[in-house]
């Protein structure tokens, strides 16, 4: 049983009451089948339109829970929290080992998608907190030596190939293997469905990223370390629904966020600006059929070079049964 101090217990009680004042324990939750990144022990679950993020390390769990609770008081209106998944509190649930684990309850961002395409992008020039050991800093820097230069890296993606009716899935090593001149191609992979570049999606994603950037430029309370941006869109172009309802761009994985006073998060801003710049470049290139074909060929070549093949897989689409979870 995890031991919390009085302040931590207050945060946990507040979060548990927010979701369900009766404190009932969930039993019918299922593994989440669209996780493309995250630590191997942090397997998400789903329940009635919610995503359940489990307690793995108690201190980090409470920190993230505390942050979401703070957002609820600082930003009382939902539209003020547009950059985050909707937060519902915390809950206890039975594990497959018949133990009881606490979970953070968030909205399922894939709920409006029949065939969701998902990319997880680790943001910031620095993916470790300033207080960690020199060894930890070195290990984090070695994960992707271009993180400081580029300000982000792809930690996992799955994109639907409409021609083959299957998913292309990459793991964490794919993103770490991208050289600076390959990053555009890595991002392009996510917006191609084998037939065309999803310009309709790209426009919305750029708009939403700019909204987050504008918020980051004025907020001076939070420094986000080891946090990601999750981008989701509907992969089935045969649906006649408006694509904008499926496109989600959210900041996730907030456990390593530090509260500060009077400082903008320059590392995160650097990464956001570069990410938006790459996507603008991709959009510009797609204005001619010749450039679009050239970029698509570059993407195909990228995922078929010997160094990349071990990091890319293909799985047939069977409803919502594709699972890919790995440490980021």
Task: Name these PLM-found stretches.
Residues 1-328:
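Polybasic, positively charged surfaces/segments
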């Amino acid at each position: 049983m995890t031991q919390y101090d009085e302040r931590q217990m207050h945060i946990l009680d507040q979060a548990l009451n927010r979701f369900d004042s009766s404190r009932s324990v969930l039993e019918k939750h299922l593994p989440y089948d669209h996780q493309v990144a995250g630590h191997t022990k942090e397997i998400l679950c789903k329940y009635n339109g919610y995503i359940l993020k489990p307690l793995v390390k108690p201190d980090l769990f409470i920190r993230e829970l505390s942050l979401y609770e703070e957002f609820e008081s600082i930003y009382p209106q939902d539209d003020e929290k547009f950059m985050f998944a909707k937060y519902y509190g915390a809950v206890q649930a039975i594990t497959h080992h018949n133990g009881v684990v606490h979970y953070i309850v968030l909205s399922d961002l894939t709920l409006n998608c029949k065939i969701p395409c998902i990319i997880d992008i680790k943001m910031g020039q620095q993916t470790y907190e300033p207080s960690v050991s020199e060894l930890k800093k070195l290990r984090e820097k070695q994960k992707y030596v271009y993180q400081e230069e580029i300000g982000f890296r792809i930690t996992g993606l799955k994109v639907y190939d409409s021609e083959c009716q299957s998913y292309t899935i990459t793991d964490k090593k794919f993103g770490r293997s991208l050289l600076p001149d390959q990053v555009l191609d890595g991002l392009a992979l996510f917006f191609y469905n084998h037939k065309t570049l999803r310009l309709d999606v790209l426009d919305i994603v750029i708009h939403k990223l700019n909204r987050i950037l504008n918020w980051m430029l004025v907020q001076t309370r939070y420094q986000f370390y080891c946090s990601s941006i999750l981008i989701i869109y509907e992969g089935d172009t045969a649906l006649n629904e408006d694509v904008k309802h499926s496109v989600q761009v959210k900041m996730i994985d907030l456990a390593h966020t530090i509260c500060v006073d009077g400082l903008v998060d320059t590392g995160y801003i650097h990464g956001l600006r570069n990410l938006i710049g790459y996507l603008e470049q991709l959009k510009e290139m797609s204005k001619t059929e010749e450039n679009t074909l050239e970029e698509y060929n570059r993407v195909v070549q990228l995922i078929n070079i010997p160094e990349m093949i071990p990091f890319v897989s293909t799985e047939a689409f069977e409803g919502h049964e594709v699972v890919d979870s790995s440490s980021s």
